[in-house]
Design a protein with these regions (language model features):
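N-terminal signal peptide c-region/cleavage motif recognized by signal peptidases
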Residues: 17-21
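Sequence context surrounding c-type heme c attachment/ligation sites in exported
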Residues: 29-61, 67-152
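Cleavable N-terminal signal peptides
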Residues: 11-12, 22
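Bacterial N-terminal signal peptides that target proteins for export
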Residues: 1-9
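Feature targets compositionally biased, intrinsically disordered low-complexity regions
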Residues: 8, 14-16
Length: 152
């Protein structure tokens, strides 16, 4: 059931994203909401995995595989919402997402690469390897948060 709901929601979000062919016609606030929604969903599916990596939550291979699959898609979604027209919209994103776009893109690519590795490792069933990859993936999240997001 969750997979069906997620698939429908993802299809709606992707459809909305693809229908917005010219960013200049899209309200900057809409782009910010889109990227924030993708980040919230990443947090939802990352939370249990982070808990497993830290030993706070019992390891569950099925949850790892499912959530890693969701994260593989979600890790690609927010980036087209970080455009110059959004710089004046209140959000936690620092101006560096625009002014240092190359470094920001590198961080995005690292995240996507590590999430893809997590998906592959999760299929192998080796708990130690999965936990090691969870740590590596988590570090890529921190790389963006440290350099491109306001400190909380």
């Amino acid at each position: 059931m969750n997979k069906k709901i997620f698939s429908i929601g993802l299809a709606v979000m992707l459809g909305a994203g693809y229908s917005l062919t010219a960013f200049s016609q899209v309200k900057p606030e809409t782009l910010v909401k889109q990227r924030q929604a993708a980040m919230v969903l990443q947090g939802k599916y990352w939370g249990p995995l982070g808990g497993m990596a830290q030993g706070k939550v019992p390891y569950d291979a099925a949850v790892v595989a499912r959530n890693a699959g969701f994260l593989e898609t979600l890790s690609k979604m927010p980036w087209d919402g970080f455009v110059p027209s959004t710089k004046d919209v209140k959000s936690a994103a620092l101006l560096a997402v625009i002014t240092d776009a190359a470094k920001f893109k590198e961080a995005q690519d690292r995240l996507q690469s590590e999430v893809s590795k997590l998906v592959a490792v999760s299929k192998g069933g080796d708990e130690a390897a999965v936990k090691a990859q969870l740590v590596a993936t988590g570090k890529t999240c921190g790389g963006c948060h440290e350099n491109f997001r306001e400190k909380k």
